[in-house]
Design a protein with these regions (language model features):
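Active-site loop signature of alpha/beta-hydrolase-fold enzymes
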Residues: 24, 69, 173
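N-terminal nucleotide-binding beta1-loop-alpha1 segment
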Residues: 15-21
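Short beta-strand segments at enzyme active-site cores
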Residues: 18, 59-66, 71, 167
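Short acidic, Gly/Ser-rich segments with clustered Asp/Glu that frequently serve as metal-coordination loops
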Residues: 22-28
Length: 210
């Protein structure tokens, strides 16, 4: 895995995409407390470890967040997921709920893309165009959730001809067993499944050389 991962995740063509790592989703006062607790147990600490090493190696970091107007104008109302937590948290642009968690940045070299609709950033933002402009062909997907958004971005990215890496200890879903089943039975057929430590080892070899 190490040699193959080194080529697949080479900094020159790789970006980390963080998915909904924002206050309203996995912060201390998140709308879905169970998901936030699960994400903060393992995934968030590992993402926090991963990003500085990735940046130092020259890997791009793109944060994908979700935002809504208080009246929901222009946002989806056509699935149950969009009603969960409605009114309990504020994801108005510029609020803590709609902002990347401070422990993750954003740093000056990071990009932040926010969406108004949908369940994933490929269809709801300029993510595809931005990644292509950056020369990215491999995406490392981290964040939440394994229930919906992570499978969505993995499938969309594969359909758009990207190679995808999923560090299994830097993504989260509920219940934990379901998240693991999604990784083992679905995402493993679409993406390279690895760990935070394996990526850190790979990128540490590039530190200061990009």
């Amino acid at each position: 895995m190490t040699d193959r991962l080194a080529g697949l995740a080479a900094p020159g063509h790789t970006a980390i995409v963080t998915q909904e790592c924002q206050g309203a989703v996995i912060g201390p006062n998140a709308g879905l407390a169970q998901l936030a607790e699960e994400a903060r147990r393992e995934a968030l600490p590992n993402i926090t470890r991963m990003l500085p090493v990735a940046r130092a190696a020259g890997v791009r970091v793109v944060h994908c967040t979700v935002q809504r107007r208080p009246d929901g104008l222009g946002a989806n109302h056509n699935a149950k997921i969009f009603a969960i937590g409605r009114g309990e948290v504020n994801i108005l642009p510029g609020t803590p709920g709609a902002t990347v968690l401070p422990e993750l940045g954003p740093e000056p070299t990071d990009l932040v893309l926010s969406r108004w609709h949908g369940v994933g950033p490929m269809g709801g933002t300029d993510l595809d165009a931005v990644l292509r402009n950056l020369g990215v062909s491999t995406i490392v997907v981290v964040g939440v959730s394994l229930n919906i958004a992570i499978p969505n971005i993995v499938m969309d990215a594969v359909n758009a001809a990207y190679r995808v890496i999923v560090p299994r200890d830097a993504v989260a879903g509920i219940p934990t067993e379901y998240g693991n089943a999604i990784i083992d039975n679905t995402l493993s057929l679409l993406a390279t499944i690895t760990s935070t430590d394996e990526l850190l080892h790979t990128w540490s070899q590039h530190k200061g050389t990009s």
